[in-house]
Amino acid sequence: MQPLKGITVVTLEHAIAAPFATRQLADMGARVIKVERPGVGDFARGYDERVHGLASHFVWTNRSKESLTLDVKHDEAQKILMRLILEEADIVVQNLAPGAASRLGLSYETLSKLKPGIIVCDISGYGSDGPYRDKKAYDLLIQSEAGFVSVTGTPATPSKAGPSIADIAAGMSAYTNILA
């Protein structure tokens, strides 16, 4: 069963949280178009080479997606991206650095005026307001700040949980909120 067949997602994503959310959407039948940086793409491509020369995390979170390389720092690429969103996207997902999506004209405020009914999901470690809104976040940092590493490892050498639990939880939360 593919309840999201006919839905198109355009995503600017990297690492785990957003790719995990959009993988879930792809698994439900959505067409997911992942926009990647030229030359390197998603940095998760370089985590390891366990799956036929590809990074296991990348394969795990990016199956069933299409990939488009665009250097969104250039005006022409921004025009291509905006045309793709306005003509094709039902949903836009991003986990860029704080403020980057707004600078690219990809905020909900901007996109909803251009395309009423579009769903925009911004994934960040600290949300859009509050004292940490402009800070980047990573799984280990969030696990540490939440006190999780204090209950793993030993008192002398606390350690991160094996999987990226904060990123996976953020991705699952994003996925369920998109569906809501």
Residue ranges and their predicted role:
Residues 1-180:
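N-terminal helix-loop segment corresponding to the beta1-alpha1 unit
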